[in-house]
Amino acid sequence: MESMVNNLWSSWDTLSQATASTGGDMDAASVASKQSPQESKMAASSMIWSSFSEPQKTPPTKRASSSFFDDMFTSSKDHSTTLTDKMFERFLSMALPTTTTQDGEELQSILERIEMQKSRPQLSLNVMSKNAIQLLSRLSVPFVLIDQVIIIFSWSKPLYTLTFLNVATLLILKPILLLSLPFFYTCFEIIVPAYMKRHPPDKHTILQNRNPIPAEGPSVSHVDVPRPVPELSREFVLNSTDLQNHMLLYVMSYDFVTSLIVKYLYFKDENITIFIFVALLTSGTLLTLFGAQVLSAMLPFIKVTLSVGLWAATIAMHPNYRSTLLDMLYSEDTRLRLLMMSNRLELWLNKELNLREQKEVKETEIFELQHLDPETHNWQLICFSSDPYPANSHARLNNLPLLGTLHLSQVKPPEGWKFVDVETAVNTRSVDGWLLDLTPEGWIKENFLNETMDIDEDEKWCYDLVTKFSYQAGLTTNEKKTRGEVRRRRWIRYCVRDIWDEDDQMEETVAHRRNKSMESSNSLHPVKSIDSVDG
């Protein structure tokens, strides 16, 4: 907390000095340089509070626009950042975490958005409030459409609902009318009412306010164009209220769609997700190849189905049937029936698509390296390393430092994995959970070290092979291979993913170890996907 306060005070001092340096002239700077530190601090504080009380005035500057979208999404009135916005940015940078994902890595989409935000103004409360006011003053049309949909399906105006059903049925049966609908709407809902406002009909004694004959001659009224509603108006308050109430429509829709996607598409149940993937892939392929023929053959059936479904859904929402339908849908019997059907379907899919794979169990290897002391003729530990350090290795030929540790307990599992300790009768020697590899022939063949190492069958040490030549009288030479001054043996330990349960880890590891024990001593070990261990 103290460091946070110190950072804030330092930011205040920096910003106050920047404001004072840009706002003052040379004389003021000379006077400020002669002041004491306490007086300069008080002057800076007064200047900060004055900047809060009075808006900062900056000369208008022209900004070179990099693209059309930058001009569209940036404010053209004010491009300067006030002191309040700078402090707000500092608070956000200190309060918000630097990452957005659980594993500590930024998503690619977040990084792309951050890169795009660099050419736009930063978050500002003033700009946010201005943009919100401008949006609310122009947000009447969506809320009017939502109200019309509610009126139609609530049967508040039965004739209006029936008219909508007839028009919708006509559009379904003859889809080409969808192209002509915007033209008719523009003519009869925009142009004709605008003409009637410019040429209002005279009052008729018999027809009263329904006289269809407009006034003759030139226009008798001014042009009434749509414009944003003012802030102090009832329509603005209605827009604010509707925005507050209709926000939950998007929230509920988002939550519903997300729940379905997470349950069926994100491998929460692998069998169901695989079945959906195969079904979607097959459907997409068939529609790509035979979609035109299938749709042309089924088009009449689709039209009739959509029309009947629209009428049935609208009639079901009638007040006389709505309460009965909702009671039936929200009843406990319906919920249990749907739950049983879904469970039965999931059980059938799990039975037919038994694709449960065995969990990954990997071997982690480490080599114990020792060298022969020429004075005492005793073997001394070099280190535990992931490199077997053969005689022809690059590190050994170039005298490079060998990475390792002196204690076996300090060896860490690979990232994303954790060790599992299993006691078996195959390896009786165990040190800190590590098991001695009793079949070194396997890893020697894997690393193509057959000609450079000699195996001690008793303790499973692998010695360097050194070739010595001896010359005899004449032209003959004798080769003799002896053991070198470095030996190593392999320790293994099993590791599993760190997201598994402990019971599953033990079961899978024991099964894996039993399969390994049944292999022949001359057989090759499985190729390991993890070959390095951090020491």
From Swiss-Prot:
Pfam families in the record: Pex24p
GO-annotated biological processes: peroxisome organization
InterPro entries in the record: Peroxisomal_Membrane_PEX28-32, TECPR1-like_DysF
Annotated localization: Endoplasmic reticulum membrane
Domain of life: Eukaryota
Membrane association type: Multi-pass membrane protein
Gene Ontology CC terms, in alphabetical order: endoplasmic reticulum membrane; peroxisomal membrane
Record keywords: Endoplasmic reticulum, Glycoprotein, Membrane, Transmembrane, Transmembrane helix
TM helices/strands, residue ranges: 139-159, 176-196, 247-267, 272-292, 297-317
Region (Disordered): 511-535
Main location as per UniProt: endoplasmic reticulum
Disruption phenotype: Does not lead to any peroxisomal phenotype. Reduces the number of lipid droplets and leads to fragmented and clustered mitochondria. Also results in retarded growth and reduced mitochondrial activities.
Keyword Membrane set for record: yes
Glycosylated sites: 239, 271, 450, 515
Function as written in the Swiss-Prot or TrEMBL entry: With PEX23, contributes to the formation of endoplasmic reticulum-mitochondria junctions which are important for mitochondrial function. Involved in lipid dropplets formation.
Membership in a protein family: Belongs to the PEX28-32 family. PEX29 subfamily.
Official protein name in the record: Peroxisomal membrane protein PEX29
